[in-house]
């Protein structure tokens, strides 16, 4: 593989994440809400609680978590039409990914017969919307679970581990972390990696665009993703600590 450039078009090093920040509580009625910013990508993540579970889950004493994902009309250079009656395959794939990733770290017995509803609405899309949605939704979910314990709804938080996600890819034969749109749109390989706080993988989504990639290239991309995910989890913890100190 060719040597990585010292800097990318936005000035980042190949192994450098985009700037990460969180705006808390933009919605007054949700159990928790935030806007997560990764570079120019911004996603509104909110959590609501229903005191019931899907019909197939009733009587088991177990909870459930469901996620929805949408691109808002003005989130891209050309307006995105609202998906009303029928969801696109991409939207269905992404919201299932978000739900799977978060359910993996929820103790459904602690939740009881309740459903946590996660909504991820993309305000601005500059690539990495699914990974930003997972990373931001985990933060919103953490805040929601803490609130439910404080309110006496739950005895203890059902959240048992941390989750973050990041993209990696091959662009002009070079491995890059956290691709923006200018990179993602010309990547030969696009990989999304979801990881739990204990370092175990929750999901890997990888696609070759035009030509196959090797096992060694896959390993290089995973090796690039791992420290990036650790940094994102540290940023999640820092964001919550800063939020807690002013509330």
Swiss-Prot record:
It comes from the Bacteria. Signal peptide: none annotated. Its EC number is 2.7.7.56. Pfam families: RNase_PH, RNase_PH_C. The keyword rRNA processing applies. Phosphorolytic 3'-5' exoribonuclease that plays an important role in tRNA 3'-end maturation. Removes nucleotide residues following the 3'-CCA terminus of tRNAs; can also add nucleotides to the ends of RNA molecules by using nucleoside diphosphates as substrates, but this may not be physiologically important. Probably plays a role in initiation of 16S rRNA degradation (leading to ribosome degradation) during starvation. Belongs to the RNase PH family. Homohexameric ring arranged as a trimer of dimers. This is Ribonuclease PH.
């Amino acid at each position: 593989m060719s040597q990585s450039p010292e800097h990318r078009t936005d000035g980042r090093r190949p192994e450098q994440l985009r700037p990460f920040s969180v705006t808390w509580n933009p919605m007054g009625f949700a159990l928790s809400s935030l806007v997560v910013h990764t570079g120019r990508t911004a996603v509104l993540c909110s959590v609501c609680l229903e005191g019931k579970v899907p019909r197939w889950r009733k009587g088991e004493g177990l909870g459930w978590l469901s996620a929805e994902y949408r691109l808002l009309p003005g989130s891209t250079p050309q307006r995105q039409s609202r998906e009303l009656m029928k969801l696109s395959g991409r939207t269905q794939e992404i919201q299932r990914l978000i739900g799977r990733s978060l359910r993996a770290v929820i103790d459904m017995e602690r939740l009881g017969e309740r459903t946590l509803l996660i909504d991820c609405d993309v305000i601005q899309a500059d690539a990495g919307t699914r990974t930003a949605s997972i990373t931001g939704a985990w933060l919103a979910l953490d805040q929601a679970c803490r609130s439910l314990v404080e309110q006496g709804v739950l005895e203890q938080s059902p959240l048992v581990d941390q989750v973050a996600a990041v993209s990696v890819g091959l662009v002009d034969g070079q491995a890059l972390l956290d691709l923006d749109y200018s990179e993602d749109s010309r990547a030969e390989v696009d990989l999304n990696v979801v990881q739990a706080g204990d370092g175990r993988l929750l999901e890997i989504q990888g696609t070759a665009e035009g030509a196959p990639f090797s096992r060694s290239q896959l390993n290089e991309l995973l090796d690039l993703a791992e420290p990036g995910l650790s940094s994102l989890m540290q940023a999640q913890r820092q964001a919550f600590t800063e939020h807690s100190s002013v509330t």
